[in-house]
Amino acid sequence: MDVWSGCMKGSVFVVLLVFYVVTGRLLSKEAVAHVLGIDNLPANRMCLTTDEYLHGMISLVNELPRLSMYLVIKGNYNAPERIASNVNQIHSTFKELNLKNDSLRKRFDSIKYDVKRLEEILYDLTLRGLLGTSGSDCPDLVPVTDAAFSEQFYTRLC
């Protein structure tokens, strides 16, 4: 089953990213497996391992500073604060895990650089007096314009 591990990590990342962009929330391992349609498969056929889920979560965290910068460019100055809070919570949770010196540990170490990038974004916004100045017309995250996609995505989760 290791032959699919790289694809599974990428798929987990995509599901986590899309759900985060649409809702601003994270998905559990079980919810990701449900979205991917592998929650009811026998374990000997295909399953989502904790390692694959954690790799996908780290990939999400690595992408969030970019999303934060994009939202600032679009005029949403409040979202980076929420994103930074989520990343800090994820980082704290990963610190509690006893990770061995393997690829997951090396990827976990990259989170501290993402935390730093988000802190720099918040620092810049604070210096410019922009933190907390988003108008009510600015979306929380990136708006999804395709209602059919959004409805299918939510239906798949339930």
Give the location of each predicted region.
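Non-catalytic, interaction-prone regions of core transcription and DNA-replication machinery
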Residues: 1, 25, 44-47, 53-56, ...
